Swiss-Prot record:
Record protein name field: A-type ATP synthase subunit E
Annotated Gene Ontology cellular component terms: plasma membrane; proton-transporting two-sector ATPase complex, catalytic domain
Topological category with respect to the lipid bilayer: Peripheral membrane protein
HAMAP family in alphabetical order: ATP_synth_E_arch
Subcellular location(s) of the protein: Cell membrane
Organism of derivation: Saccharolobus solfataricus (strain ATCC 35092 / DSM 1617 / JCM 11322 / P2) (Sulfolobus solfataricus)
The keyword Transport is annotated on this UniProt entry: yes
Transmembrane residue ranges: none
Length: 194
């Protein structure tokens, strides 16, 4: 073998070794590049998912807040209209006190209460419009004093002086009690319900 052949053989061998090493280096570089790429994709995918979850939570929170606000607004509106009904009913008391049933009821209450008091002094409070009617019902009973209360719309309050007890038969109190007990039914009638 001559020198040139030997040199060619050596060069070919070195060339093959370099080629193999370059191929290995290229494979390693591609592997590192793919790993880096996958890591970056994974990190950003995780961040995007976290942002999506956070945004969904914010949206759900806002949705819940709006639902509560809507319910509160509806309740305020319902309360407004229920109070309007109450005001209208309260305005009708003037018509109620003109009826025979009202006068009969007051007479029955006074008769019953006066029978129970015997010798105790009582004061009956009534609206200015009812004073004459009450005085007529009481008659000449010296244990009963009739006084007016400008705040009363109708009905009576009986104050027992010895015991300090007051029995309230005022229409406003009765209306308040009935209205409070029927508030749910009134709401159902106005806004639908059960």
């Amino acid at each position: 073998m001559d020198f040139e052949q030997l040199l060619d053989k050596s060069l070919n061998k070195v060339r093959e070794e370099i080629k193999t090493e370059l191929s290995k280096s290229l494979d390693e570089a591609i592997k590192l590049l793919n790993e880096g790429h996958n890591k970056i994709v994974q990190e950003y995918s995780q961040r995007i998912n976290e942002l999506i979850v956070k945004t969904k939570e914010e949206i759900e929170g806002e949705k819940a807040r709006l639902e509560v606000e809507n319910k509160r607004t509806l309740l305020v509106e319902k309360e407004y209209w229920i109070n309007k009904v109450y005001e209208r009913v309260l305005g009708k008391i003037g018509e109620v006190v003109k009826t025979k049933e009202y006068k009969d009821a007051i007479e029955n209450i006074i008769s019953k209460e006066i029978k129970e008091i015997r010798e105790e002094k009582v004061t009956i409070y009534c609206s200015p419009n009812d004073k004459l009617m009450i005085e007529k019902i009481v008659g000449n009973n010296k244990n009963v004093t009739v006084k007016t209360d400008e705040k009363m719309l109708g009905g009576i309050k009986i104050y027992f002086e010895r015991s300090g007890l007051t029995r309230d038969f005022s229409l406003k109190l009765i209306l308040d009690q009935v209205f409070d007990s029927m508030r749910g039914k009134i709401s159902d009638m106005l806004f639908g319900g059960k």
